[in-house]
Every structure is written in structure tokens, then in C-alpha cells.
């Protein structure tokens, strides 16, 4: 009992540490220049305290701890405030806090000249808190609060520089695409309420219903919107219009992994539903390949990293599709470290080059930004799944499991090609941004000696090297791993990754001296993001607008305002006058007869005189 009390008190301390800076916003401290420092310190302390219950939980061998507070009863349904602390939430909380701590410290350097930096830090903290609510929720209502919370905070943070049209458009785009996903979530909530009369996860899992395709498809739609899967993915690269710390937090430990986390939470329902698994697998495979293709030809450093996130999210969805939720969760945790670090390194480069994001205008940075360069290379290698870095422990396992599971060969092939492309676009970033000769303005002064820049990247660098081993050692698998495997399957992931590296280097070296006279169709497809934004954002609105214009002009103007009223009145008037009178309305003839009469009268008067 004492262990549980200590456990509960340490968790409460962690969460209260996070809410303290929010409470301080109502005092004069919020106007103080040291407020960002307070927020950063609060998160660092919360991380250190959160390690205590996590360590206790892992080594005590518990399955989960659920705390329940009755809130209200609506007719027959009981609504509770219920927190579920299992392996997933207990490991994710310290990871999210650690990554956010580093991002907050980096923000103090990156956003130092922003007049509203205190508000920025408050928004970032609220973003983290809503994610914590989502992760620890034990019922759909709390999950929905966290879900909508990360949605609205992402809108406020992506549109932070609201004086720019692009930032406003990107923020609105993020909200609108997520609205489509939210429809699926609300549909699933309504279905569970009507059919099972509960929103509690445990009660949903134990109540056997014959056909769960409708709510599961709703949840998959919700995950597609939030985790930027194919079809609802265009908002993710657009979200790069926000400040770099926002991109780092959005892509590492909050918003985008929420969709994958939702599917992990509801995995017990999907476990024996083959239709749902196949749909999830195919969606993930298409996403991971399509976004990897798009990343190959982008020139904006942040957009390349954004597409790599979408590709990794596709890989996580593939993992859920092959019935391995613990592996998907492991990839969420390992991905958070190196993805946050990649964004912080790109932020360091962008800030030092006076907000230049085009990799064609960089080059030679290994001489002037040695620490950033080292971190970027380690992060890129971790992303590609280089052995014994963080990414290897999850990515290699996922591909091995996919190779040996009863999956369809098509989805597996797409995933392997996408893995190869990951190495290709990572090589491209390193080649263009870091190597060769400088291609930027020589007047730029570059300095990476601020501890606010070095320390967070250093922490994430250590995480990108060691975290994978530590986390994989402490996550218990939910299914029996493959005992035996042929050598060629074991080395498949490494082989395709090395192939990607070699091809990318070969292409980069070739394109230095030779350039395509006319870009190929494949290049256009990749560079224009598969024509997706053009079709969705240009062609479809144009069709809708032209149809509405025709309806307005034909239906309203021509038919109602012209034909139905004035013309019909004149037509009926003419018909009735022709029917009633003998006169045919030949006005020229009438005038002629009138003139003839007048002339005859004049002639008679003249002759009389």
C-alpha cells in the first residue's frame, strides 16, 4: 500500500509541477523576463520526479494502475475522471518531458527577441499538458479533451507569426484537416455510447460486440487526420510555417503521435479484426512510401524533416497493422529523441543563416557549425536505423517482424522501398547543407557557442545514442518474438538502408556536374508532392466555385430574377392581350395608318383653302 501511495504522490507532484507555471500567468510573474526560465525549470524538475514512479512501475512488474473519481451520472451512464497508468503512459511521460525540457531551453535562444516570448512558453507548456491528458486518459471523454487540446494549441502555435499569410493559412489548414479526423472520433464515441453505453476503455474491451468495423474505422479516420496519414497529410509540411521549436515539439512528442497512440490504446479491439488490420497496414505502407518520395526532392530543410516524420508515422501505422502495438510505441519513444534533435539542429542552422531554409543556399557548415553538424549527422543516422543508435532498436525490429509475419508482400515491399529512401533524403540533407563549399552570404556571422543552444542538443544527442537501448530493454513485448530467422531476412533492413545511402551519394555526385535539361515526370511528381495540394487545394475549389457561379447565374439570375418574374409577366400580358383584342400589336402599321390619316386631313384643309 505504501508503494502505491508513493507512486500516486510522485505522479501528482509531476503533474502539479507542470500546472504551476500556468497558475503563475495570473500573477505579475507572467510579465517578468524570467518567466521562460521558470517554465523550463518546472519541466526539468517534473522530468526528474517522473523518473521515480516510472522506475518503480517497471521494476515492480505491475500491469497497470487505474485511478477513478466519479464525476457525474447522465441517466444510465456514469462519467468518471479516470487515469490509466500502464507501460505506455508511464514510459511516454518522462520521454515527452525530457524532449520538451530540451525544446524549451532551445526556445530561450531561438525566440529571445520575440516580444511575446512569455505567451509562447505558456502555449508550449499547455501543448505538453494536453498531450499528458491524452496519454493518461482511461475514457473516451478525457481522451477527447486531450485530443482537442493538442489540436487548438497546434493552431495557436503554427500561426504564431500571424502577420504572415502563409502562417495563417498553415494554421487553418491544420485545423481543417484535423476536423475531418475529429468527425471519425466523434462518430466512434457516439457508436460506443449508443451500443455499449460506456466510454470507459476497460468496459469497451470486455463487452463483446459482433461488428466493430464502424467505430474502428472512425478511430482510424481520427488517427489519419492527427498523424497525417495519406489523404489528410498536406497539413504536416505546411505546419513548418510555425517557429522551429513548435515544429520540434509538434513532430517529436506531441500532436502527430497522438493518432498512433489512439490506435495503440484501442488495439485490443483491432487484434482479431482482420479487415481493420489490413486497412491499417495498407494505409501505413502507402503513407510511408508516398511521403518518402515527396521528401526526396524538397529543398526546404524543415519540409524534408517534416516529410520524414510523416514517413515514420506511416511505419508506426504499419506496425499496428501487423499486430505489434508495443513496437509502434517503442518507435514513438525512440523517434522523439532524434526527430527533436534534427529540428533543433535545423533551427540552429536557420537562425545562424538569417532565416535561410533552402539547402541549396547552405553548404560547408561542417567548418563553422561543428557541433550542430555532428548532431545532425548522428540524428540522420539514427533516423535511417544505423546499428546501435536509437532508431535501430525500433526500426530494425519493425522490419524484421514485418518480414516474418503473415503480411501481404505489397505492403512489405512499399515499406522496404521507403526505408531505403529514408537513407537517400538523409544523405541529401547532409550532402547539401553540411559538405562542399559555402553557398551563403559571406557577411553572415555564425555563432553556436550559446549554452542555451548547445545543452539541449547535447542532451538529445545522448538520447539519440543510448535511449533506444534503455527503452527497448524496459518495454515488455505483447506477443512472442520470432525465434529463428534466415540471415537474409535479418540483414534486410540494413541492406536496403545501405543501398539508399549508396544511391543517394551516387546521384548527388552525378548531379554536381550534370543537370537534367528537362525535369522528368517522376521528379515533378515528387517535387509537387504527388500533385496532391494542386488537386485538393486548387482544382477542387475551382470546380466547386465554378459550379456555384453557374448555379448562381443560371438558377438565381437567369431563371428566377429574369425568366420567372419580368419575362413571364410580359409573356402572360402579351398572350392575354392578343387573346382578348383583335389588335396584333403591329406598332409600325398603326403609326403608318395614323400618319396617312394625318396627311389626308392636311391635304383636305389645304385644298379647302
From Swiss-Prot:
Q: Which gene encodes it?
A: MT-ND5
UniProt lists the family membership as follows: Belongs to the complex I subunit 5 family.
Described by its record, this protein's role is as follows: Core subunit of the mitochondrial membrane respiratory chain NADH dehydrogenase (Complex I) which catalyzes electron transfer from NADH through the respiratory chain, using ubiquinone as an electron acceptor. Essential for the catalytic activity and assembly of complex I.
Q: GO terms for biological process?
A: electron transport coupled proton transport; mitochondrial electron transport, NADH to ubiquinone; mitochondrial respiratory chain complex I assembly
Report quaternary structure and partners.
Core subunit of respiratory chain NADH dehydrogenase (Complex I) which is composed of 45 different subunits.
Its taxonomic path starts at: Eukaryota, Metazoa, Chordata, Craniata, Vertebrata
What is this protein's name? NADH-ubiquinone oxidoreductase chain 5
Q: Where are the transmembrane segments?
A: 3-23, 41-61, 90-110, 115-135, 140-160, 174-194, 214-236, 244-264, 276-296, 304-323, 328-350, 368-388, 410-432, 460-480, 491-511, 585-605
Q: Which NCBIfam families match?
A: NDH_I_L
Which PANTHER family does this entry report, sorted A to Z? Answer: NADH-UBIQUINONE OXIDOREDUCTASE CHAIN 5
Organism equals: Halichoerus grypus (Gray seal)
Please name the Pfam families in this protein's record.
NADH5_C, Proton_antipo_M, Proton_antipo_N
